[in-house]
């Protein structure tokens, strides 16, 4: 039996009570992961005020219900978040196209490369082990973090999350990647010269 990458004990060590979570954050990013078979989609939020990043999972459901609610949710928040990082072979392209059609700002929607997806997985694993993230109780995210195993990506030794329920923790890693690497500042106004 393959061991989980994060595991229940390590993940439980990053748990905080909901009342201790700030009501607002200086920087916010979203991560969206479609499951490999395209049957489910997960949306995670990563936010920080300069310290540890806080992770939540507001959306995780079958794609059979469609993605209209997810697209709307992401579009109305585009003016407050630095980015949304969208990954997955099934559904990701259509989601990105719909967001662009709704006129979200340039640079808001990001599609990660294989190397960036690898970085996202290692980033969330490392952050869980070093106290770099917090989260509130969320059964879908907690189960994913406790059970997701290692999946090889490419031939260069890269890895990501695998297993039956990896989409929530992968979405969290993508959100954390966006939070730490995006240069987009939604509060900055463009200057016309």
Indicate where each model-derived feature is located.
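A short catalytic or substrate-binding loop motif that flags glycine-/basic-rich loops and adjacent residues
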Residues: 21-25, 34-40, 165
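ATPase catalytic-site recognition across NTP-hydrolyzing enzymes
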Residues: 1-32
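Flexible loop/turn segments at secondary-structure boundaries
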Residues: 3-4, 36-41, 51-54, 63-66, ...
């Amino acid at each position: 039996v393959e061991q989980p990458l994060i595991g229940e004990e390590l993940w439980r060590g990053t748990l905080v009570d909901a009342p201790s979570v700030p009501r607002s954050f200086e920087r916010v990013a979203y991560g969206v992961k479609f499951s490999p078979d395209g049957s489910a989609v997960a949306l995670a939020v990563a936010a920080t005020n300069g310290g540890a990043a806080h992770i939540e999972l507001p959306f995780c459901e079958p794609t059979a219900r469609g993605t209209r609610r997810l697209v709307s949710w992401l579009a109305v928040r585009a003016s407050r978040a630095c980015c949304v990082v969208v990954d997955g072979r099934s559904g990701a392209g259509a989601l990105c196209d719909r967001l662009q059609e709704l006129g979200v700002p340039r640079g808001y929607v990001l599609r990660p490369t294989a190397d960036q997806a690898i970085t996202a997985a290692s980033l969330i694993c490392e952050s869980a082990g070093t106290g770099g993230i917090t989260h509130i109780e969320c059964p879908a995210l907690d189960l994913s973090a406790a059970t997701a195993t290692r999946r090889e990506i490419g031939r260069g030794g890269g890895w990501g999350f695998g297993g039956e329920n990896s989409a929530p923790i992968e979405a969290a890693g993508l959100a954390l990647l966006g939070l730490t690497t995006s240069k987009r500042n939604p509060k900055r106004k463009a200057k016309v010269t």
